[in-house]
Amino acid sequence: MSSETLGGRPVFRLAYQTPSSWAAMALQDPLALLSDHAHCELKAAITAQALVAKNPEHSSILHSLPRVAIEELEHFERVVQILEERGGKLEPQASSPYADGLHKGSAGTRNNLLLDRLLLAHLIEARSLERFHLLSKEDGDTELQELYSDLLVSEASHRALFINLARELFPLDKVTTREGFLRELEGRVIEGLAPSSRVHSGPPA
């Protein structure tokens, strides 16, 4: 994982920086967090597969995103295994105010669906990377520290892949402008969410 640092903490180029206290709040219910995390991995795999299925004419998508889908499913299996070993179970998928906010907030100004999907995937991976970094540094649960530390490299790789695909397939000025708009939207959405034991929850009250 490579990123800039500010005061010793990585900067993930997000409009809103999650406070360090978020990790302790999210870990108050580790089973709920793990169940939600597993669903995040599953949805990420589905997103990668859908991008391939709907855009097979783009060879860069066709040949890069299947590997992302496989990696996300491997992460899903690992998280579910830890969840079950702790006596928990995968709960039914709940609605995601985070994803809903991103898609509803971007729909009215959207000019190209593929561009938005790539950029939103990039931003979601960036936010997940930031949250996993915080969880990997939170004392008290060595197993989860190891889990989230192990996932940082792949999350950073996926984050970079999605923005690079956007830059390859669309004019750079268009990508830069739209990414800036969506980055600000993402920051507003997640800052306004309620606190909970979910990967993409709001800050502590």
Where are these regions (language model features)?
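Non-heme di-metal
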Residues: 1-205
